[in-house]
Amino acid sequence: MVLLCLILEGQWQQKWASLKQNMPALALTVMVAWFYLSTIWTEASKTQLEYAANTHWILLLVPAITLLIDDQRWKKRCWQGFGAGMVLLLAHIYALGFTSIPWIRSGSPSSVFFNPLSQSVGLAIFSALCISQIVGNSNRLRQLWLAILFISASYAVLSISQQRLGYLMWATACLLVLMLKLKPVHRKLGVAIALGLCLVVFMSSAKIQERFGLGIKEAQAYHFENNYTSIGSRLHMWYGSIRAISTAPVLGHGLGSYPMVAEAFFKDAAMCDVGCKHPHNQYLFYGVEFGLVGLGLFLWMLYRAMIVHRSLNQDSTMPLVVLLVMALSGLVESTLWYRGWVYLFVPLLGLSMLSPTQGDSKYPHKHDPDS
């Protein structure tokens, strides 16, 4: 509906001028155009091509968001909306400890938001958002409520969840916020204390130690021909993806081609059920389907989005957290392909591509999107 209304509204010259001023959004638009151009040489079946075509267009919501949010008030409201959504998610997570909720399909507190991994990473970002609002806030009551929300979200990530990626992104996001928000005189001490707390959490949690220990064992026990573990399957996908890239390095195998290409290096049907959908690595995924051209456009988009916030001012804190978390999560997950990740990152990516000064001339007194 958002895209349809933007199309029906017209005003193409104004929209094009706005898009050209936002280089990250323009880079993403060019990237998506390249994806669909690759249908000319794709090796995908008709079914796979249709599924891929119905997935990648959602990325166009990112430039749509940058066109629609043109003042500081709406940036602030959108971040508040994300926070409200995470509070609602936390309410469901803790309520499931006492009763069943009919509209939650899994019934598990770790899988309320479609997918356990995206849920834990989303709560990790929310934890960082809470810290960003606590630091420098003079309202003690508000600080107290934010601290309660931070503890609730952190407990959901570190104790209720069993996701290694969630643990790592929680630590990464919280540390980055402290590095960006604290004054230089307090920065080293604050980060040192935070690192110490992370170490205490790790040493005091048998579950976290067990999950990381299991990951190390799975990596050590990996065998190319037959491995069904979480880490082993990923290693197999990545190795096969690199081989697939080498056979079509520049243009790739085309839109929706990964399942067809992956069947060649997944001899076991059970492993193919897991690994023939996507390679659990956003960079290799784009490399296989869209070649070095598509991968280069993706990296260019990330780079342009990050340098928008190179001034490291207050408004850059959460966008940089989102971009770093998405970039790191993309090393082990297909963060712009799988639905659970798309629901999380597409709206946040749109917010993160907005310049810290976008809309200041219209509403200069409303300059606090992190609130």
Question: How would you name each of these model-derived features?
Answer:
Residues 224-239, 243, 247, 251-290:
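Long extracytoplasmic/lumenal interhelical loops at the membrane interface
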Residues 179, 188, 289-324:
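Hydrophobic transmembrane alpha-helices and their immediate junctions
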Residues 1-9, 52-62, 118-127, 167-175, ...:
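Membrane-embedded alpha-helical segments of multi-pass membrane proteins
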Residues 160, 181-224, 239-247, 255:
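A membrane-periplasm/extracellular boundary helix in multi-pass inner-membrane enzymes
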Residues 2-6, 174, 301, 319-329, ...:
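Transmembrane alpha-helices of multi-pass inner-membrane enzymes
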Residues 16-30, 74-82, 143-146, 313-322:
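Membrane-interfacial loop-to-transmembrane alpha-helix junctions, especially the N-terminal start
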Residues 74-105, 114-182, 193, 203, ...:
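Alpha-helical transmembrane segments of multi-pass inner-membrane proteins
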Residues 6-14, 36-93, 328:
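Transmembrane alpha-helical segments and their membrane-water interfaces
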